[in-house]
């Protein structure tokens, strides 16, 4: 081989060696490449998104009351077999699918399994087994966003999208590298919570009483002086952690009955009484033969029982339909409708941005020009539909001395760590609807309903109460028998009202426990410090 060829060969070898050295130097000094290489040996697992909780008026949690557990599973561990009894059906199916996986994963388990030698992490369980105010609070979708109720209305406040993450150094087979431990990295920011006006103790007492006494219906309890709602119950309930089962369940469990519109019946009669007192017609007296006839149409009192000579007090105590038809004629449709509108009938209410109660139906003035329509309207039937929330607002106005306080459900956002109030969310408003003297007279009249009239079952064990019964026809039938809505709306104590309470049982033939009797039990619970 000539010297020239040898030199060329050595030159080529030298250049190749130099290229290798340069490449090695570049690999060692290039941090981006090093980071990418390291990332290929790190598994990052995301825990469920953090979400702010709901709190009651005293700062007690209404959601996030318990914990659930996530077990960290690595390929090649016998933890799969150990975890199988602690997983639900979906989790067991996942264990089977992932038995030959090459990556770690998190598995929902029913309890802390760290005693089995498996790494386990606690995460908040959003809803308890017996959740409180589930129709009001609502539920989440599969992505952790609010799908209904206040969860949906306040999703922008409660959901941040931030998640805690687990960083695991793993081998090519997805197993944890020897000598390393998973690192839990906390989210950068915490979500805000929301304080509601509900009282957890009162809500729980009302829900327990409803479960014992009602098949379908609702309960509302309001603080008279502020309009703040302390309890909002709707039956039947549902499991917020498994909403799918309730979508087609009987009784429409996802429906919040407190915000839905129903035939009102005689619970509407205090509206006419207020209009009469304001117009100076509170002394109107009528002889009741047990019915009222108009243009060939007969409007009967309950059981067609004659009530004799009755004034406003006796008409409320006996719930005399004929009296209120005649009183309505004396007042005129415009006066009665105006009072109903001032008390909130015919208008929906914003519970929170994006969550609104039904408006119900307040018949138009033109409709009430028809004498038959107006006659039905005067005792709460016909086209009139009202929500329990509207009825509560009306009764609370009487209890509060003639001042209408908008019923409130939401107070403010709070710091999840300290409980400190951050941003007010309540938009309270108050307005005078009728004179204080009118309210005082109505309070005495409605106390008479409980003491002497159709509402005697509403009498509490201690003290006195006031209110009005209502049995509303629905036009719906079951096995040939008409379904009715059974109401009691009132306040307690009668002398110095503190609580306004509405009990409504819908679509019943005859409830096992009357709404008035449930009202009395609620008064007793409140008196005992519920």
Predicted segments, located by residue:
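Beta-lactam-recognizing serine transpeptidase/beta-lactamase-like catalytic domain environment
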Residues: 61-63, 223-266, 271-505
């Amino acid at each position: 081989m000539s010297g020239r060829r040898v030199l060329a060969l050595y030159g080529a070898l030298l250049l190749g060696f130099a290229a290798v050295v340069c490449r090695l130097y570049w690999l060692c000094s290039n941090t981006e490449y090093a980071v990418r290489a390291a990332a290929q040996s790190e598994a990052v697992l995301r825990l469920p998104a953090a979400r702010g909780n709901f709190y009651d008026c005293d700062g007690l949690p209404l959601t996030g009351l318990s914990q659930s557990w996530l077990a960290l599973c690595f390929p090649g561990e016998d933890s799969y077999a150990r975890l199988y009894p602690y997983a639900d059906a979906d989790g067991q199916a996942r264990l089977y699918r992932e038995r030959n996986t090459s990556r770690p994963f998190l598995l929902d388990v029913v309890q802390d399994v760290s005693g089995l030698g498996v790494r386990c992490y606690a995460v908040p369980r959003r809803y308890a087994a017996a959740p409180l105010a589930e129709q009001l609070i609502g539920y989440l979708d599969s992505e952790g966003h609010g799908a209904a109720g206040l969860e949906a209305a306040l999703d922008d406040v409660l959901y941040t999208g931030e998640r805690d993450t687990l960083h695991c150094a793993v081998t090519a087979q997805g197993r944890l590298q020897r000598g390393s431990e998973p690192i839990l990295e906390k989210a950068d920011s915490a979500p805000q919570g929301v304080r509601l006006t509900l009282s957890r103790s009162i809500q729980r007492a009302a829900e327990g009483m409803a479960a014992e006494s009602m098949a379908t219906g609702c309960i509302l309890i309001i603080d008279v002086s502020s309009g703040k709602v302390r309890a909002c119950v709707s039956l039947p309930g549902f499991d917020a952690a498994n909403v799918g089962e309730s979508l087609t369940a009987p009784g429409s469990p996802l429906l919040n009955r407190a915000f839905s519109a129903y035939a009102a019946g005689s619970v509407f009669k205090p509206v006419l009484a207020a209009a009469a007192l304001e117009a100076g017609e509170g002394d109107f007296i009528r002889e009741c033969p047990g019915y009222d006839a108009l243009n060939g149409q007969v409007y009967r009192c309950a059981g067609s029982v004659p009530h004799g000579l009755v004034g406003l007090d006796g008409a409320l105590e006996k719930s005399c339909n004929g009296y209120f038809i005649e009183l309505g004629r004396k007042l005129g449709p415009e006066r009665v409708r105006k009072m109903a509108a001032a008390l909130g009938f015919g208008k929906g209410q914003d519970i929170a941005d994006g969550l609104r109660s039904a408006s119900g139906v307040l018949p138009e003035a033109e409709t009430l020009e028809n004498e038959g329509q107006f006659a039905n309207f005067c005792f709460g039937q016909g086209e009139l539909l009202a929500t329990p929330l509207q009825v509560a607002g009306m009764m609370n106005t009487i209890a509060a001395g003639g001042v209408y306080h908008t019923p409130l459900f939401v107070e403010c956002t709070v710091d999840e760590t300290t409980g400190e109030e951050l941003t007010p969310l309540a938009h309270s408003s108050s307005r005078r609807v009728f004179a204080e003297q009118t309210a005082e007279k109505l309070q005495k009249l409605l106390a008479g309903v409980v003491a002497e009239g159709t509402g005697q079952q509403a009498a509490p064990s201690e003290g006195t109460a006031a209110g009005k019964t209502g049995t509303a026809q629905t036009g719906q039938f079951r096995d040939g028998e008409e379904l009715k809505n059974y109401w009691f709306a009132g306040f307690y104590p009668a002398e110095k009202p503190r609580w306004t309470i509405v009990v409504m049982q819908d679509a019943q033939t005859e409830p096992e426990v009357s709404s008035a009797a449930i009202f009395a039990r609620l008064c007793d619970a409140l008196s005992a410090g519920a």
